[in-house]
Amino acid sequence: EVALVRVAQEEAEDVTNAMWEEVVRLRDVLKYEFFFPRTTHFAADVANEVDIAYPGWESETFDAKEILPTLAKAKLFVAHRTIGPFLESYGIAADRLALRAPDEEIDREEFILECIGVAQQRWYQKELYSPESISRDLFSGAVQLASNRGLFEPGGPELAAKRQDFADEF
């Protein structure tokens, strides 16, 4: 669901290929939160899930403009409850990281507490979908992902651009 919405928003020309690219990107983003099967099994699992909601989808050609109306006809949406809090938390952490000077040392614990405070404020302002997004564990996962991508250690001006790209993902 999340991959398809993003593909629709980007108005991709090759919807199927763009969907798979987005699914792989989401898998990479959430790799510290979920245990995913090997790539071949993962692709088969995703294809089976899509087939439940939209039988025969692999044999059709889609236009990005058709995605949202097609999704609107689905009987059950689960992504917002399943991975929504993860993406909200990661988005907050990525935004906070992008605001930091690239040469600044960042204390991980203080950063996580800052993210929790911002998340609580956004919840009170009704800017978050779920209070589950206010989670030390989820912010720790976001820090781990940012660290894995080399975005948490001090660096030069190029680091600021990489951090902003990371924030833009969410």
Regions found by a protein language model. Give the residues of each.
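Membrane-interfacial terminal anchoring regions of lipid-handling membrane enzymes
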Residues: 1-170
